[in-house]
Amino acid sequence: MRGGGNMQQMMKQMQKMQKKMAEEQEKLKEERIEGTAGGGMVTVVVSGHKEVLDVIIKEEVVDPEDIEMLQDLVLAATNDALTKADDVTAQRLGQHTKGLNIPGMM
């Protein structure tokens, strides 16, 4: 069979890549990524799996007369953390798919 060895080598390479990616996914679960808003008045911490782990609000930003501002800050900090989590994930997993031209892969 022509090219059979090449296909077998490619399959081994894919299996190796899958194993490394699974290991990176596990590491990402333990990663803590912070997003902030309002000059650090609100901080949201997420895992690499995009699970919100903590929300920290400094006392001086709490104004009962302006709840909307606090809501906006929490939303902005959350979105910042999630964007950073996406960046970390793309960087970590992308290093294992570099050079491969497989549709649907990073």
UniProtKB/Swiss-Prot annotation:
SUPFAM superfamilies: YbaB-like. It comes from the Bacteria. Residues 1-34 are annotated as: Disordered. The keyword Cell cycle does not apply. Pfam families: YbaB_DNA_bd. Residues 20-34 have a biased composition (Basic and acidic residues). It is found in: Cytoplasm, Nucleoid. The keyword Transport does not apply. Its main location: cytoplasm. GO terms for molecular function: DNA binding. GO terms for cellular component: bacterial nucleoid; cytosol. Residues 7-16 have a biased composition (Low complexity). Keywords: Cytoplasm, DNA-binding. Belongs to the YbaB/EbfC family. Binds to DNA and alters its conformation. May be involved in regulation of gene expression, nucleoid organization and DNA protection. HAMAP family: DNA_YbaB_EbfC (MF_00274). Homodimer. This is Nucleoid-associated protein MCCL_1934.
